[in-house]
Amino acid sequence: MKKHNILIIGGYDPTGGAGVIADAKTAKILGVNPLTITTSIIPQNNRAVYDKMDIPKKIIEEQLEAIFEDFDVSVVKTGVLNKDAIDLILKYKRHYDFKIVCDPVLKSTTNYKFVDEDLLRRYIDLFNESYLITPNEEEFNTIINFIEKNNLWGNIDKNPYILITGIDDKLTTLKDKGIIETIKGKKIDKEVHGTGCVFSSAIASFLCKGEGLREAIKKGKDVVLASVIYATKTKYNYNSNPTYINKEKVIKNLSYALYLLKKIEFSLIPEVGSNIAESLLLPNSFKDVAALTGRIIKNKLGGFYIVGDVEFGASEHIAKIILTAKNYNPQIRACMNIRYEEDLIDALSEKFSISSFDRKLEPPNVSTMEWGTKYACEKFGGVPDIIYDKGGDGKEPMIRVLGVNTIEVVKKVVEIQKIYDHI
Ligand SMILES: Nc1ncnc2c1ncn2[C@@H]1O[C@H](COP(=O)(O)OP(=O)(O)OP(=O)(O)O)[C@@H](O)[C@H]1O
Ligand SMILES: Cc1ncc(CO)c(N)n1
């Protein structure tokens, strides 16, 4: 089977939030082999871009020669380029068959200008040879105005796709102007450095794996949304953290979490049994949440059985906790219920953040899990590690452990069991 090699050609951001490092991290998590060529060294962080040193044309060419001599490349994704780099990419495009995904990085989010009019004129030739161009709204307007002002439509004989990126993206083509499709997004209240790089390299990676354009954009959108939600906090802002949450990842996490649970003498099992669940990113319904179709139940030997399989849509009860918690922290995608013990809660307060709800305060005609989780999160001011209630009306008291995924949740349960065993 042909190896998926993507060639990333762009600038070097030492923080890895943008540029070839961000692109390579994105390609790697998507199962594509990232070959990278650096066109310029760009000292920067979330505060500013401090400088830009272009790599000599000879060294860029030697990097290209080294790669094409030894690898088959199906997609080339471009970031910050200079004139030499564009000249060379177009030269190699004449001799090798690869798709170009061009992310026209005209300036940084910290307003450092990467492209002057002379270089933008050369970019038009690269756009003409590209399969897809991914400008943000401002870059798109700059490009179209430049072509109009300089009457350059005659230099364009092909019709590349353009994805105008934003929270909602608009798919069009360079010549047809009309919007073919709008891809709706979800806004997270964060300014994250490098999202354009992650989004365009994710789309390029899915294309490299053989996905069609629309599927590549749709999956790329999930990648960049996760990369924003799990972004790395820096002193001045956030750096993109290339992350991809899909059904395969959720099932793998759950399987490994159950593997870890079986390694301990887990005894904090409630009468109704435990379940453990993990959701896709920003789940819309319990169908986006995977859990056990059965339960974790005590056996007569003091141990426990894990009954059932892991399936999406298997648990509405635990799913409601996750579906509610995500509104307070979109990173929280997992939960497991364990047995409540009176003196355990006090013992846990040193290591874990805890909140609770009281069933006696529950209003009529509500889902207890939705109301209780909302109540506990609002009282806590976010999503705590633990939400408990002391039961009532024939309902068993319960502890619910929450986390970013089921592996983290089980590691918390292992710690809780240790504390319980030593009370
Ligand atoms: N705060 C956010 N919440 C959700 N999605 C976001 C957010 N910021 C960026 N994105 C996603 O990242 C994609 C690219 O972001 P944007 O359009 O800002 O590119 P850009 O301006 O080129 O970014 P940069 O220059 O920082 O690399 C958007 O299409 C959007 O899906
Ligand atoms: C190296 C590099 N590539 C792309 C961007 C776009 O944000 C940046 N700031 N730095």
Q: For each predicted feature, which ranges?
A:
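Conserved phosphate-donor
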Residues: 132, 139-140, 153-190, 229-234
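Extended, low-hydrophobicity segments enriched in charged/polar residues
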Residues: 248-360
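Phosphate-handling active-site elements
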Residues: 30-35, 180-182, 206-221
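C-terminal binding/interaction regions
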Residues: 342-423
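Charged C-terminal helix
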Residues: 54, 70, 215-284
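Conserved beta-alpha-beta core of the PfkB/ribokinase-like small-molecule kinase fold
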Residues: 75-150, 164-171
